[in-house]
């Protein structure tokens, strides 16, 4: 049983760092149940992955695309529905900003209001 080395694979993938990334990704794929394309020969998954790359039974380009795809994150942007946009944009029937009156509070009124607040009960988390 001959062990595969990085030297056997370097002609398939030029960059050693990229080779390690691809072999690691393929080893994780094998661990998650992906079928292997070479005889296992009692080898562990990283060795099997390197042997697959060296024997060209898996394409490094396909592995690279799959690795990139697995690392990408897709976040869904919550956009407003088309029918609600005109309702928000139009201010017909709405109150004009100049008509809004806000209550003003002095500093003394604020302090008096804060002093009237009851502190929350002490929990077990606050002790110790």
UniProtKB/Swiss-Prot annotation:
Catalytic activities: RNA(n) + a ribonucleoside 5'-triphosphate = RNA(n+1) + diphosphate
A GO CC term attached to the entry: DNA-directed RNA polymerase complex
EC number(s) stated in the UniProt entry for this protein: 2.7.7.6
BP terms from Gene Ontology: DNA-templated transcription
Keyword annotations of the record: DNA-directed RNA polymerase, Nucleotidyltransferase, Transcription, Transferase
InterPro entries named in the record: DNA-dir_RNA_pol_omega, Pol_omega/Rpo6/RPB6, RPB6/omega-like_sf
Protein's UniProt keywords contain Transcription: yes
UniProt enzyme class: transferase
GO MF, one example: DNA binding
Chain's role: Promotes RNA polymerase assembly. Latches the N- and C-terminal regions of the beta' subunit thereby facilitating its interaction with the beta and alpha subunits.
Membership in a protein family: Belongs to the RNA polymerase subunit omega family.
Quaternary organization: The RNAP catalytic core consists of 2 alpha, 1 beta, 1 beta' and 1 omega subunit. When a sigma factor is associated with the core the holoenzyme is formed, which can initiate transcription.
Name of protein: DNA-directed RNA polymerase subunit omega
Originating organism: Azorhizobium caulinodans (strain ATCC 43989 / DSM 5975 / JCM 20966 / LMG 6465 / NBRC 14845 / NCIMB 13405 / ORS 571)
Origin organism lineage: Bacteria, Pseudomonadati, Pseudomonadota, Alphaproteobacteria, Hyphomicrobiales
């Amino acid at each position: 049983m001959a062990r595969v080395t990085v030297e056997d694979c370097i002609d398939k993938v030029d960059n050693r760092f990229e080779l390690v990334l691809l072999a690691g990704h393929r080893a994780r794929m094998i661990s998650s149940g992906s079928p292997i394309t070479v005889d296992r020969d009692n080898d562990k998954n990283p060795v099997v992955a390197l042997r697959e790359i060296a024997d060209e039974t898996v394409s490094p380009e396909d592995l690279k695309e799959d690795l990139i795809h697995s690392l990408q994150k897709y976040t869904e942007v919550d956009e407003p529905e088309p029918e609600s946009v005109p309702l928000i944009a139009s201010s017909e029937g709405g109150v004009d900003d100049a008509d809004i009156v806000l209550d003003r509070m002095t500093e003394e009124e604020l302090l008096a209001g804060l002093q009237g607040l009851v502190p929350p009960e002490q929990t077990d988390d606050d002790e110790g």
